[in-house]
Regions:
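Conserved alpha-helix/loop element of class I SAM-dependent methyltransferases that forms part
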Residues: 2-20
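Conserved class I S-adenosyl-L-methionine
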Residues: 19-29
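Class I SAM-dependent methyltransferase SAM/SAH-binding core
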Residues: 31-77
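A short acidic, Gly/Pro-enriched loop at the edge of an enzyme's catalytic core
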Residues: 79-86
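Residues lining the SAM
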Residues: 90-92
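A short glycine-rich, Lys/Arg-flanked "PGG" loop and its adjoining helix->strand segment in the class I
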Residues: 104-116
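SAM-dependent methyltransferase
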Residues: 121-192
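C-terminal lobe and adjacent flexible extensions of AdoMet/dcAdoMet transferase-like proteins
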Residues: 184-241
Length: 246
């Protein structure tokens, strides 16, 4: 279960204490991860663009008897979202930004939303995943009341892909309705993310892969960045760390 993996990774890297537990989950969707964070003892706020998703999230939190605030909003503007000890952004949601300028803008918004020494964790597709694994990917599911077609293609920009999804859902009268979705994603080289994080103000960050506390390999599918907005740092050590990925 991916949500188990996201939760376990988060708990290893978010230093929650009695006085330090306010968490903002970006792109929270239907609130599955938000509920898990709340059950783990965090004071959770979930933010998402979709009002429909947030309605489901509110019902999910209520059913789980968890007090969670949900905000309809865009991660490109967190000026009204408040201040937090921790911010997370999972399920490669950063990859939905249009370009690296927007990625950098998100990082700046998160930095400003964090309390001092706050931690920001996000995951993105690796360039191996977008360049070698996804292009030509095809998945079809056919059940009695539901069918799904999922095809992925390489897009024009470097390290970018397009997911084309078609759903057929059986209605009460027995007929099937068709729903089409197109998802465009793009990732970047590790050094690009490093530079954008530094420009946003983050001076301390570490890189992991595939939900484990290990450095990425050439075939890692998902990169995890754990960034902290500490004010004082050893600039030489930071420079050497960044250079190790160049």
């Amino acid at each position: 279960n991916l949500y188990d993996l996201w939760t376990d990774f988060s708990l290893r890297h978010l230093p929650k204490t009695k006085d330090k537990k306010k968490l903002l989950e970006l792109a929270c969707g239907t609130g599955i991860q938000s509920v898990r964070f709340s059950q783990a003892g965090f004071d959770v706020t979930g933010l998402d663009l979709s009002a429909d998703m947030l309605k489901i999230a509110e019902k999910r939190a209520s059913s789980a008897k968890q007090k969670i605030d949900f905000i309809e909003g865009n991660m490109l503007n967190l000026s009204q979202a408040g201040k937090y000890d921790f911010v997370t952004c999972y399920s490669d949601s950063i990859c939905y930004m249009q370009d690296e300028v927007e990625v950098g803008d998100v990082f700046k918004e998160v930095y400003n939303a964090l309390n001092e020494d706050g931690v920001f964790i996000f995951d993105v597709h690796s360039t191996y995943q977008t360049d070698e694994v996804f292009p030509g990917y095809s998945y079809h599911e056919n059940a009695e009341e539901f069918a799904m077609l999922w095809d992925t293609y390489e897009d024009a920009a470097p390290h970018s892909i397009v997911h084309e999804l078609t759903f057929f859902v059986q209605e009460e009268d027995g007929s099937f309705s068709r729903h089409d979705e197109v998802h465009e994603e793009r990732t970047y080289e590790v050094l690009t993310y490093d530079i954008l994080l530094e420009q946003a103000g983050f001076k301390s960050f570490k890189l992991y892969a595939d939900f484990e506390d290990k450095e990425p390999t050439e075939t890692s599918a998902r990169w995890f960045f754990v960034a902290q907005n500490v004010r004082a740092y050893d600039s030489y050590r930071y420079y050497c760390w960044v250079q190790s990925f160049s």
